[in-house]
UniProtKB/Swiss-Prot annotation:
Record-linked InterPro entries: aa-tRNA-synt_IIb (IPR002314), aa-tRNA-synth_II (IPR006195), aa-tRNA-synth_II/BPL/LPL (IPR045864), Anticodon-bd (IPR004154), Anticodon-bd_dom_sf (IPR036621), DTD-like_sf (IPR023509), Thr-tRNA-ligase_IIa (IPR002320), Threonyl-tRNA_syn_edit_dom_arc (IPR015011)
Functional description taken from the UniProt entry: Catalyzes the attachment of threonine to tRNA(Thr) in a two-step reaction: L-threonine is first activated by ATP to form Thr-AMP and then transferred to the acceptor end of tRNA(Thr). Also edits incorrectly charged L-seryl-tRNA(Thr).
Reactions mediated catalytically: tRNA(Thr) + L-threonine + ATP = L-threonyl-tRNA(Thr) + AMP + diphosphate + H(+)
GO molecular function: ATP binding; threonine-tRNA ligase activity; tRNA binding; zinc ion binding
Coiled coil: none
The keyword RNA-binding belongs to this UniProt entry's keyword annotation: yes
Protein name: Threonine--tRNA ligase
Gene that encodes the chain: thrS
Record GO cellular component, one term: cytoplasm
Domain remarks: The N-terminal domain is an archaea-specific tRNA-editing domain that hydrolyzes incorrectly charged L-seryl-tRNA(Thr). Catalysis of tRNA editing is performed by the charged tRNA itself.
Keyword match Zinc: yes
E.C. number(s) listed in UniProt: 6.1.1.3
């Protein structure tokens, strides 16, 4: 933040034309014997109370030294070339005004933000009448650290005992220990190159070098995996046993909309801004679209609870050096489910089932979660038994972070972490109980007494983002390899489920007939018709992690059977209909997608 102090005998201003979509009411004003604070809010400035107290303290100190009887906060964009976004600047100026007003024993005024203004000023011309300052948010950092220390952590066991994380016995809880070291004691995460990164290339998960940092591209194998997870997220959402409405919408929203602006402020500087005729933000989750739609629905208490799901392309401006393939991205896909409930009691009841499904789904990968429950102090005091019940359902201790104050739109924010092959906690799934956004966006329902009420909203990503779910899948493969096992993707998620390899050209027709049958059953199958040796074809299929390799020669054709090499499961001969049944059994309850590649390997470019 840059400021110019002018001690003025008199100062007046009058708004003329709007300069921004985001603006205050156009009020005129004047002051005598005033310290005029021309203020430019810069990128990186935040509406943090400790930072603003530091700025206000300097303003008031100067006002006292020059014996000013009034202070005027005047938005002035011409002191810096690195300005904050309008919504941030406006919030910072408004909060600075409130802090100065609460501490200065005199008149405090503020000129409106977002206008071209005419002003007249008469500077008093003494040695302290013209001063400049530059402030950085770091100046309030020590106070912020002290405020953060008012947050506290406890470990709650399934029988309701409460423990200090520093004194807890972690002998049987290695994953919890890893989470506590990261979250409570801020220890550095384990180093080293994660093994899963080696796997991604073969499936076509890559950075896009011609885009912004943190943006990926997805080859055909990666694309089918992504879309299968997207499809599966809807199946999982419906398994909650409530009505679920799947929607689609835009990824850009106007910052001039009050609800959008106030919600965006909660997210801070990680926003993607698009400069057009008006300032737009790229959504960081599906909240904006779903809430904008729900506010137009006529909802009765009889409809609740219900869910809205969108596979939202989401944008978060992560630091370039922090982006990681599949895990921390600037653009990703979020199967974002919002569940609308009558009140907090019903929301808590719904989350019991939600909690069960979240653990069920990670369990299907052979993994489990270690949980961090972020709660407001009021929720913790009033609903501690609810947290104990969730710990009981998990069958192990949970970490709880208690946050004082009411500065959050949620009362509960749960993070579900796996511990990766390097021993690092990695958040995958989540849910929140939101008590603020229904009112912010004007989402209402009519209760049984014909009264208008605001629903309590559960935000959840049951599987996590699409990419993070796949990250968990590939990290599981890394753990398998570390344990000396053969990594094997779930059959439903394998880009190619069966590869048919004819021993010779004479067997190609039979191979095609086998592929036709499998394809008709919704199985993703391809044929290696290249002019390569049989051993190389088998080796390439194994390197590609194909779950089932079918080798057919003249003998198999004569006998009407197929020779199968199952990944991690040996070799055997069976009839084709038996293989179809086996694949159907393995993929029951999961979505189907066709092959996104030419069926014949000879038709693929060398990248494949």
């Amino acid at each position: 933040m840059r400021v110019l102090y002018i001690h003025a005998e008199r100062f007046n201003w009058e708004p003329r034309d709007p300069a921004l979509d985001i603006r205050d009411e156009p009020t005129s004003g004047n002051a005598n014997n005033a310290l005029v604070v021309f203020t430019s809010v810069e990128r990186g400035d935040v509406p943090d109370e400790n930072f603003l107290r530091a700025v206000a303290s300097d303003i008031i100190d100067v006002a006292k030294k020059v014996k000013a009887s009034a202070i005027v906060i005047y938005p002035y964009a011409h002191l810096s070339s690195d300005l904050a976004r309008p919504y941030t600047a406006r919030e910072v100026l408004n909060k600075l005004f409130e802090v100065v007003k609460s501490q200065f024993n005199g008149e405090v005024l503020k000129a409106p933000f977002g206008y071209y203004k005419a002003f007249e000023i008469k500077c008093l011309g003494h040695p302290l009448s013209e001063l400049s300052r530059s402030f950085k948010p770091e100046e309030g950092r020590a106070d912020r650290r002290a405020e953060e220390r008012r947050d506290y952590y406890v470990i709650i066991t399934p029988n309701g005992e409460e423990h200090d994380p520093a004194k807890f016995n972690y002998a049987n809880y290695g994953d919890l220990k890893a989470l506590v070291e990261k979250e409570v004691f801020r220890k550095e995460l384990g180093g080293g190159e994660p093994k899963y990164l080696e796997y991604l290339r073969k499936f076509g998960f890559e950075w896009e070098p011609m885009s912004d940092a943190g943006h990926m591209r997805y080859a055909p194998e990666a694309t089918v995996m992504m879309e299968l997870v997207e499809d599966y997220s809807y199946i999982v959402a419906k398994s909650l046993g409530i009505p679920v409405f799947k929607i689609r919408g835009t990824n850009m929203f106007k910052l001039s909309e009050k609800a959008i602006e106030s919600h965006a402020r909660l997210f801070g500087e990680r926003l993607y801004i698009v400069e057009s005729d008006t300032d737009l933000i790229l959504r960081y989750a599906a909240c904006f679209q779903q809430f904008a739609m729900a506010k137009d629905w006529v909802i009765s208490y009889k409809h609740l609870p219900f869910g809205m799901l969108e596979i939202a392309d989401s944008y978060r401006h992560e630091q370039p050096g922090e982006t990681v393939l599949l895990f921390r991205l600037r653009r990703f896909y979020m199967p974002d489910l919002h569940i609308f409930t009558k009140d907090l009691k019903e929301a808590m009841e719904v989350t019991y089932k939600l909690h069960e499904v979240i653990f069920r789904e990670i369990g299907k990968l052979g993994r489990t979660y270690v949980s961090l429950y972020n709660v407001t102090e009021g929720f913790y005091k009033n609903h501690r038994d609810y947290l104990v019940e969730l710990a009981r359902r998990e069958g192990k201790p949970i970490l709880v972070r208690v946050l004082p104050g009411q500065k959050y739109y949620w009362v509960l924010n749960v993070e579900f972490h796996i511990v990766d092959e390097l021993g690092r906690p990695r958040e995958i799934a989540t849910f929140q109980i939101d008590v603020g956004n229904a009112q912010r966006f004007g989402i209402k329902y009519v209760d049984e007494n014909n009264q208008i009420k605001y629903p309590v909203i559960i935000h959840t990503a049951i599987l996590g983002s699409v990419e993070r779910y796949l990250y968990a899948v590939f990290d599981t493969m890394a753990k398998m390899e570390k344990e000396g096992k053969v990594p094997r993707l779930p059959t439903w998620l394998s880009p190619v489920q069966v590869r048919v390899i004819p021993v010779s050209k004479e067997n190609l027709k039979y191979a095609i007939s086998i592929a036709d049958v499998l394809e008709a059953e919704g199985i993703r199958v391809d044929i290696d018709d290249r002019e390569e040796t049989l051993s190389k074809k088998i080796r390439d299929a194994e390197t590609s992690w194909i779950p089932y390799i079918v080798v057919v020669g003249s003998k198999e054709e004569a006998e009407g059977v197929i020779a199968v090499r199952e990944r991690g499961g040996g070799q055997y001969k069976i009839r084709l209909e038996e293989l179809v049944k086996k694949l159907k059994d393995e993929t029951r309850g999961y979505p189907q997608r066709p092959l996104y590649l030419p069926r014949l390997l000879s038709q693929r470019p060398s990248r494949f």
